[in-house]
């Protein structure tokens, strides 16, 4: 007590020093009330800034006031308990309380002086931060810079700063602070009784006080200036707050540190509990000193304030109670120091006791833990301090001191909370911890070092955890507040909170928590929970301070207010707060005030955590949970926190982070949750904070939040590594910039210490529990980011991140992205889990530090997805059974149909939503959509080259265009990349080069008009292609010159050195030759390597010897010389004549067999790939071309085959082309070397390669060069026509119809021009061309929409003239009528009436006649020839029916494949004939029967036509080659050779007859419809006969084809016997007819004249005649006696009574040969026996013409083969027009009776009525001789 008195004597001068904490409280009170300033000038001076903060907060202000006034009563005891590390402090405050009040009284008495002194001193403290008027304060002021480090470390850095202080002057400062805290705190609380307070202080810290007061004395003089005292009072308080008090405590400890420590431990223990309880209960007196200290710190931006603030809840109560007296002046009258000490100790003790109950289970656990661990903690702390560097011990003392002075009032509690915060690190990261990190700074520093030890040890963590929990909660509030306070939060001081990492030191205590955080196990939680529970309780008690805090929250600057609130809550968190305090450095007062009232003020920076912390934001808590588990376990929140393992809720947190991003909600949560709860929540949210930070930066201050965290990352990069998971915290800090700056500032001094401590922490986090530990470390991190409490989730990540904090420094870019990139904001989880490893730029991750958030709570990212899943609507199922479809096609699906010409029809379903009653969501009804027609090119445009192909290549004018096109393609190949699927092939590049080379060779071939030899330019071009790098010395240099390397040339003046020769060998050789043994001499020379001698001798020997010598030379000399002599060796072999063996030099036979042979001679075998010789093919070809030898082309072919065997197709084709003997052929030709250039037809995996347009066009270019340009009139590649048709189809499919039509025309022209039809010119080709042409004509519009787009005579005749011509007889109308009528004539008798039908027949006949082969083709070939057997059974029975249908109408398919059976050859062919596409071709275009079958069927084969046609088609195909040769005038070319007989086999009899009667003109009687053999030219003779018979028919010779002549031949036999009678008869009948006609004309002359125009002449007279019923004069034929039957209205043959039958059914066979022919035709094939074919020579041509479509030529040839049935044939011919319809079944449509042998068309022909007629009548079809005599 003497000391107090002495101190009291000192009070006037030393009050600032001794009563640093008291002065701080007084200063705060002074700030609140000016009068208090005088008394608390010293104390207030130091605490002034905190006082301001407390002033802002009512509770805090009261605490300050209480500190100033009641400090003597409560402040001293509380301060003693809180600050006194040992029981000494606690006891001394009690004993000193009386003195303290007296001291306070004297202080108040000396208030003026004190104020003056404090004013003076305050100036210094204000400048120094914590320096107070007291000398001790001055010492502390000296240390203040260090202390400010602690202040900076108020957050995480606070601990480090405290450590630094302890290590440096801080240690002394802590001692002094400790002493001062003991005394100063007492004084602060008993400011009124400062003497007593100083006495107690003197007892405990006399030595320190002396030193400190001595310092103050030096400063006291200036301090005494009263005016400045008040001003300094406010400023001095901060200086005095932590600076002096800790120094006093430390000084006191210096005197009896051990005792003090124990005393403090007891007091601290009780005081700590008291503080916890008081914080919970908002009891101010004990924490007054701390409270005022925190206020001081807050005002100073000191770090430790926040920690004190949390411990100040009781102090806040004291301050509040003291504040009133202070305001009333009661501060001076406040109880004596003894009273204050008693109250203080009682308060602390009571509070501790109360706190435990208040915490409920946590309180019990906490006190139990503290009871057990109190001493242990203190011992551990002390031990830790002992073990730790002095700095650490000092830190602990400073924590004690700070706890005495500030809410951390009880050093023990602080130390314990320190440990607890460590264990409870997750809570420490909470706002309160981070913010209150400054008081915790001691704890933080201590825990950082010791606590890290402790952190590994679970005991310490529980206490710090609890504190942190509260601090976190308060900080969460603070953080929430910070959003409102964003401007201040932006301040770096909050980054000091980041020094909460110092809390990482507390994680030393955290060891238990880490397991919790990771697993959230109860044990870690217990450890941390025990202390947290009291903390939570105290925080609960300080709920009022929390209210103050909330009140303060709106006032971020006056965080001292919130600090008091938070102090109560923060008291347990104080240790943790120490680190966080640095973050709150920007609002040091706030932090300090957090200590007194609501650490949440400090939490101001932690506000972001609060934002995150809001329990509602479980995700954040979860995110924090991983780290938090340990921390949360400490407080009741711990359990809650532990349930939140960030892992699970972390995912949830990200969504809350948006919620959290708004600071207000989280502040509400912070408020709602007890400091502990919030703290626990906040740790949980810390893990989630990563996500929250993302959002928080947005709602709160994104820049502050994000930036702050990033600063922490930078400054505390070491710790950051752990924070990486809490990467989002940077955004939180960003939202609370003030804390963030603090964090960085704290980092500076204490942050470093913290980091030093943190590494252990980070080391701990390395273990899975690291997350729990990380929560502590992360709590530090969180403290650093506490301001951005919203970084809670990231903080969770911090758990592991602190260790990775250093790693996070790389995340400075994220810091840059503090603006919080939206992506990170949107998906904080991403930042939490993934960012940690990647360390992406902040911009990528948004506000949160991506890496930090990544930590254990990466799961949090999952919730990051903000978009809601799109609603899936159900379909309305049908009720008609479709719902059972497993494919659910009733739901609709796009439909595409690809049509001809590149047309695409598409239809997409429409999904129409339909609503029904009782359903909230609509259901989908699928309906058909719009049908659209588009072009395929619109969707899939074909790759078009720069130059369009000029095809079809018809004339030399195309050369230039073709060269340009080839050049463009070559350039495209050279510039194109190798396809991906070819890149794996080692030869891909080689193959591309060879392909390009092939195209270049073809270009050279085109440029040189198909000649590659004999031209210097061509040779040079080839040389340049094969050897692009070759340098020619002259134009005449050969390709072989390339291989003479200049380096090997000897100088001209160099002496020649002959090879060494063994004279004995030469002598032996000579002796051998003398004996005449040349062969022996040769081999002797070879053995001696005398190659010159051996070759000279062998040159005159057998060639085989020469070849062997050369081969041996090559093997022994050439091959072994170098590795690149394969080409030379091969060339030597070729020169030697070893053609087949030459390729062995390139690739040995063993290699081709798959063996690898090793040469024993040179040993080079295994070192070289035996297949490398293939690459020498170009050199070999060049040598051969430059040095031609007799059989070198064979060598090139062999080389090509070798290359082809190794899939070098293009190289092989180049060799084939250059060899000039390669065989081009179809796929079916086994001898063909090339089918299409660039296509290996021998290894076709599919036919797709044959549809390659490039290959087709390249082959066409080759053909063009070798035929057109070379002057050849004949196509050299007949097989290419089919591929041209394929190309035409492809053009049509791409919509290029005009070009496709051009190709069709070109193919047709080539077929016509061919004099030697090839086997490849088959009916399939004809039908395919015809079909494509017809479809193109149908679908192609020639440009106009008008009905006559292109006026042309052809179309006009087809449309108009055909109608008129249909009534006109004669061949003139056939061409036109054929085209127009063919579609109309369906049945054999369609258009039978009148001569039109007849007239048409002749025209068709002409067409076929013009085609030589057509005439030769037999009827049978017509039908099926094309479809062979199938066509026999073609649907249409009669060829006429099909013929009537246009070729397009025919059944053939549009596919490239040509439908064999779909259409009747006869029918369709006839159509082509009509179209005149294949006038000569019809025999091919249509089964010969088709075109000509019309004639034979018309005669007697009409009934048989269908069958005959089918079989005939088969036969015709058999005879296609025959046809071609028939055109060659080969009478009977084996039809079977080309077309299979099976087609004719259906009519075996016919086939037999065919074989038996091939000579009869190759036409088999209808019976042998099968095989048709081209009629022999003998038919020509008979055709001449027919001509004679029908000499009257001028057109007959024209009409006649070979077939017609054959008909004549057939009729010749009968002609001898019948002609005479027939002629007479016909003459008579003709006379009668003419007479009748004349009479009719006489009767009707006017009508005839009445007709107008020349048409009237045609139609009028004739029609009149016909209409009149009078016969028209016409030559009826020899044997025919026709008369016009008026009843039947037709001409009737008298000799054929059946002809008079009115029915058109097949009339009875005409008498004579006609009936047999008819019956034969009806039988399906004319009986082979028919010796005389009906005179179908002419008639056949006619019927074919009448058929309208060139039926197969078989019709005309048929007559010769149908010797017997000729009458029928003529008949069919006469009905030719009709006949084509039933060519296959002439019986169904019986042909008109044919006049016996006469070629003249009979009346039947003229009438066209189906009547049995004699074959000869067919010849009557001649156009000129027929008159339309049809009677109507």
UniProtKB/Swiss-Prot annotation:
Protein name listed in UniProt: COPII coat assembly protein sec16
Give the subcellular location: Endoplasmic reticulum membrane
| Family membership noted in the UniProt record | Belongs to the SEC16 family.
According to its record, how does it sit in the membrane?
Peripheral membrane protein
Gene Ontology process terms (BP): autophagy; Golgi organization; intracellular transport; protein localization to endoplasmic reticulum exit site; protein transport; vesicle-mediated transport
Compositionally biased tracts (Pro residues): 510-524, 653-665, 1725-1736, 1757-1769
Q: Where is the composition biased (Polar residues)?
A: 57-74, 123-133, 422-457, 528-546, 590-603, 679-688, 738-747, 845-854, 1428-1439, 1513-1538, 1550-1559
Q: What is the lineage of its organism?
A: Eukaryota, Fungi, Dikarya, Ascomycota, Pezizomycotina
Q: Which source organism? A: Aspergillus fumigatus (strain ATCC MYA-4609 / CBS 101355 / FGSC A1100 / Af293) (Neosartorya fumigata)
């Amino acid at each position: 007590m003497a000391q107090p008195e002495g101190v009291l004597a000192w009070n006037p001068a030393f009050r600032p020093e001794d009563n640093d904490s008291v002065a701080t409280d007084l200063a705060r009170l002074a700030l609140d009330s000016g009068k208090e300033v005088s008394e608390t000038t010293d104390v207030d001076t130091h605490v002034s800034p905190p006082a301001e903060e407390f002033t802002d907060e009512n509770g805090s202000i009261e605490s300050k006031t209480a500190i100033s006034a009641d400090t003597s009563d409560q402040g001293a005891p509380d301060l003693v308990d809180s600050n006194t590390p040992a029981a000494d402090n606690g006891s001394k405050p009690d004993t000193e309380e009386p003195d303290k009040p007296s001291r306070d009284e004297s202080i108040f008495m000396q208030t003026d002086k004190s104020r003056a002194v404090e004013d003076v001193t305050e100036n210094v403290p204000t400048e120094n931060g914590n320096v107070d008027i007291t000398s001790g304060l001055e010492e502390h002021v000296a240390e203040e810079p260090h202390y400010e480090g602690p202040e900076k470390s108020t957050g995480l850095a606070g601990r480090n700063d405290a450590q630094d202080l302890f290590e440096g002057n801080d240690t002394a400062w802590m001692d002094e602070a400790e002493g001062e805290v003991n005394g100063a705190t007492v004084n602060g609380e008993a400011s009124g009784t400062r003497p007593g307070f100083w006495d107690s202080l003197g007892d405990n810290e006399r030595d320190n006080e002396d030193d400190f007061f001595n310092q103050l004395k030096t400063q006291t003089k200036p301090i005494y200036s009263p005016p400045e005292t008040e001003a300094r009072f406010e400023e001095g308080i901060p200086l005095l707050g932590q600076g002096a008090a800790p120094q006093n405590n430390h000084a006191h400890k210096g005197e009896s540190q051990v005792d003090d420590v124990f005393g403090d431990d007891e007091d601290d223990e009780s005081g700590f509990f008291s503080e916890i309880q008081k914080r919970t209960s908002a009891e101010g007196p004990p924490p007054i000193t701390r409270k005022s200290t925190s206020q001081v710190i807050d005002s100073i931006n000191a770090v430790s304030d926040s920690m004190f603030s949390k411990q100040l809840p009781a102090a806040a109560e004291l301050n509040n109670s003291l504040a009133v007296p202070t305001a009333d002046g009661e501060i001076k009258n406040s109880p004596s120091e003894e009273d204050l000490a008693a109250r203080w100790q009682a308060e602390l003790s009571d509070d501790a006791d109360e706190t435990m109950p208040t915490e409920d289970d946590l309180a019990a656990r906490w006190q139990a833990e503290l009871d057990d661990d109190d001493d242990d903690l203190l011992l551990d702390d002390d031990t830790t301090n002992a073990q730790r560097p002095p700095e650490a011990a000092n830190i602990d003392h400073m924590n004690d001191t700070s706890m005495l002075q500030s809410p951390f009032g009880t050093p023990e509690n602080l130390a314990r909370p320190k440990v607890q915060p460590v264990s409870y690190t997750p809570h420490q990261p909470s706002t309160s911890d981070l913010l209150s990190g400054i008081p915790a700074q001691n704890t933080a520093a201590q825990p950082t070092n010791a606590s890290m030890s402790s952190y590994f040890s679970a005991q310490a963590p529980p206490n710090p955890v609890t504190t942190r929990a509260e601090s976190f909660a308060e900080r969460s509030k603070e953080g929430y507040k910070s959003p409102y306070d964003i401007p201040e939060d932006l301040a770096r001081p909050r980054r000091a909170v980041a020094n909460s990492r110092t809390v990482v030191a507390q994680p030393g205590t955290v060891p238990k928590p880490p397991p919790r955080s990771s697993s959230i196990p109860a044990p870690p939680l217990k450890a941390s929970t025990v202390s947290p529970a009291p903390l939570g309780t105290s925080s609960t008690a300080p709920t009022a301070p929390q209210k103050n805090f909330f009140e303060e929250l709106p006032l971020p600057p006056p965080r001292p207010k919130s600090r008091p609130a938070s102090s109560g809550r923060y008291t347990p968190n104080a240790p943790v707060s120490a680190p966080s305090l640095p973050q709150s450095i920007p609002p040091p007062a706030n932090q300090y005030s957090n200590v007194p009232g609501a650490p949440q003020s400090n939490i101001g920076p932690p506000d972001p955590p609060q934002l995150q912390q809001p329990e509602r934001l479980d995700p954040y808590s979860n995110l924090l949970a991983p780290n938090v588990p340990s921390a949360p376990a400490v407080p009741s929140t711990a359990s809650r926190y532990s349930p939140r393992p960030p892992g699970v809720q972390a995912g949830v947190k990200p969504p809350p982070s948006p919620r959290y991003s708004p600071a207000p909600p989280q502040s509400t949560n912070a408020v709602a949750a007890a400091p502990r709860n919030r703290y626990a929540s906040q740790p949980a949210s810390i893990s989630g904070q990563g996500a929250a930070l993302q959002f928080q930066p947005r709602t709160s201050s994104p820049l502050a939040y994000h930036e702050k965290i990033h600063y922490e990352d930078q400054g505390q990069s070491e710790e950051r590594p752990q924070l990486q998971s809490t990467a989002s915290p940077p955004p939180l800090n960003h939202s609370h910039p003030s804390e963030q700056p603090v964090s960085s500032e704290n980092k500076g001094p204490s942050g470093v210490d913290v980091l030093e401590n943190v590494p252990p922490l980070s080391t701990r986090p390395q273990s899975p529990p690291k997350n729990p530990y990380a929560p502590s470390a992360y709590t530090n991190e969180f403290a650093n980011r506490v301001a951005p409490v919203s970084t809670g989730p990231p903080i969770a990540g911090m758990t592991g991140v602190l260790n990775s904090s250093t790693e996070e420094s790389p995340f400075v870019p994220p810091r840059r992205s503090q603006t919080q990139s939206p992506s990170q904001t949107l998906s904080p989880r991403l930042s939490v889990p993934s960012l940690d490893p990647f360390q992406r730029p902040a911009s990528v991750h948004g506000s949160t530090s991506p890496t930090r958030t990544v930590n254990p709570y990466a799961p949090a990212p999952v919730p990051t997805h903000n978009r809601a899943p799109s609603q899936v609507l159900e379909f309305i199922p049908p009720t008609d059974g479709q719902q059972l479809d497993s494919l659910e096609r009733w739901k609709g699906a796009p439909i595409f149909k690809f049509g001809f010409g590149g047309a695409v029809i598409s239809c997409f379903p429409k999904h129409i939503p339909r609503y029904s009653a009782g359903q909230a969501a609509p259901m989908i009804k699928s309906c058909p959509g719009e049908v659209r027609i588009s072009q395929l090119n619109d969707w899939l445009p074909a790759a078009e080259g720069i130059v369009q192909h000029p095809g079809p290549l018809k004339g030399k004018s195309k050369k230039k265009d073709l060269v340009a096109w080839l050049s463009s393609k070559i350039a495209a190949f050279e510039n194109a990349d190798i396809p991906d699927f070819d890149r794996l092939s080692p030869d891909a590049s080689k193959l591309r080069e060879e392909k390009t080379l092939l195209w270049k060779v073809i270009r050279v071939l085109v440029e040189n008009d198909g000649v590659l030899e004999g031209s210097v330019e061509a040779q040079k071009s080839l040389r340049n292609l094969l050897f692009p790098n070759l340098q020619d010395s002259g134009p005449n240099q050969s390709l072989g010159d390339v291989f003479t390397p200049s380096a090997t040339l000897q100088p001209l003046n160099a002496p020649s050195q002959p090879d060494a020769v063994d004279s004995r060998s030469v002598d032996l050789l000579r002796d051998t030759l003398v004996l005449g043994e040349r062969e022996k001499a040769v081999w002797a020379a070879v053995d001696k390597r005398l190659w010159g001698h051996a070759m000279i001798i062998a040159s005159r020997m057998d060639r085989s010897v020469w070849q062997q010598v050369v081969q041996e030379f090559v093997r022994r000399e050439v091959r072994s010389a170098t590795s690149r002599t394969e080409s030379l060796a091969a060339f030597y072999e070729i020169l030697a004549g070893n053609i087949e063996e030459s390729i062995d030099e390139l690739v040995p036979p063993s290699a081709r067999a798959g063996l690898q042979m090793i040469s024993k001679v040179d040993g080079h075998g295994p070192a070289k790939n035996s297949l490398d010789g293939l690459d020498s093919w170009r050199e070999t070809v060049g040598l051969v071309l430059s040095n031609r030898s007799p059989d070198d082309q064979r060598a090139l072919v062999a080389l090509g085959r070798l290359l082809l065997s190794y899939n070098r197709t293009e190289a092989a084709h180049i060799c084939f082309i250059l060899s000039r003997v390669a065989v081009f052929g179809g796929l079916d030709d086994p001898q063909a070397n090339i089918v299409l250039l660039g296509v290996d037809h021998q290894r076709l995996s599919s036919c797709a390669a044959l549809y390659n347009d490039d290959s087709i066009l390249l082959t066409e270019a080759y053909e063009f060069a070798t035929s057109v340009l070379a002057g050849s009139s004949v196509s050299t590649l007949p097989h290419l026509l089919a591929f041209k048709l394929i190309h035409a189809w492809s053009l049509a499919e791409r919509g290029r119809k005009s070009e496709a039509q051009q190709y069709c025309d070109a193919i047709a022209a080539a077929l016509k021009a061919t004099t030697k039809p090839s086997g490849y010119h088959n009916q399939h080709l004809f039908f395919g061309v015809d079909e494509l042409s017809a479809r193109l004509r149908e679908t192609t519009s020639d440009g106009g929409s008008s009905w006559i787009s292109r006026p042309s005579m052809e179309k006009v005749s087809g449309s108009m003239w055909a109608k008129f011509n249909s009534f006109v007889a004669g061949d003139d109308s056939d061409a036109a009528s054929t085209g127009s009528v063919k579609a109309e004539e369906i049945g054999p008798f369609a258009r039978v009436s009148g001569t039109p039908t007849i007239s048409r027949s002749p025209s068709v006949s002409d067409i076929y006649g013009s085609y030589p082969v057509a005439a030769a083709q037999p009827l049978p070939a017509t039908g099926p020839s094309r479809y062979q057997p199938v066509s026999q059974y073609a649907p249409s029975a009669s060829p006429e029916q099909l013929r009537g249908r246009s070729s397009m109408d025919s059944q053939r398919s549009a596919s490239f494949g040509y439908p064999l059976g779909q259409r009747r050859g006869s029918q369709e062919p006839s159509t082509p004939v009509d179209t005149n596409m294949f006038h000569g071709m019809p025999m091919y275009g249509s089964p010969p029967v088709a075109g000509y079958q019309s004639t034979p069927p018309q005669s007697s084969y009409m009934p048989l036509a269908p069958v005959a046609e089918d079989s005939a088609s088969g036969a015709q195909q058999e005879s296609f080659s025959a046809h071609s040769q028939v055109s060659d005038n080969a009478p009977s070319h084996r039809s079977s050779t080309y077309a299979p007989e099976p087609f004719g086999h259906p009519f075996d009899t016919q086939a037999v007859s065919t074989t038996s009667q091939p000579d009869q003109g190759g036409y088999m009687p209808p019976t042998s419809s099968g095989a048709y053999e081209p009629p022999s030219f003998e038919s020509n003779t008979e055709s001449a006969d027919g001509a004679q018979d029908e000499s009257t028919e001028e057109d007959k010779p024209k009409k006649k084809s070979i077939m017609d002549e054959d008909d004549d031949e057939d009729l010749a036999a009968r002609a001898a016997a019948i002609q005479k009678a027939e002629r007479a008869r016909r003459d008579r009948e003709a006379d009668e007819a003419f007479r009748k006609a004349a009479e009719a004309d006489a009767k009707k002359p006017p009508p005839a004249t009445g007709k107008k125009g020349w048409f009237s002449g045609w139609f009028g007279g004739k029609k009149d005649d016909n209409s009149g019923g009078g016969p028209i004069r016409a030559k009826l034929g020899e044997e025919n006696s026709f008369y016009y039957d008026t009843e039947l209205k037709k001409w009737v043959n008298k000799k054929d009574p059946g002809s008079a039958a009115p029915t058109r059914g097949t009339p009875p066979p005409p008498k004579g040969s006609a009936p047999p022919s008819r019956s034969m035709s009806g039988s399906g094939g004319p009986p082979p026996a028919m010796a005389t074919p009906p005179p179908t020579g002419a008639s056949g041509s006619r019927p074919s013409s009448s058929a309208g479509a060139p039926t197969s030529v078989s019709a005309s040839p048929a007559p010769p083969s149908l010797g017997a049935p000729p009458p029928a044939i003529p008949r069919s011919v006469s009905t030719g027009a009709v006949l084509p319809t039933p060519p296959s079944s002439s019986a169904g449509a019986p042909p008109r009776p044919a006049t016996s042998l006469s070629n003249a068309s009979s009346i039947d022909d003229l009438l066209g009525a189906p009547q049995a007629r004699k074959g000869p009548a067919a010849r009557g079809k001649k156009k000129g001789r027929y008159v339309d005599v049809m009677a109507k």
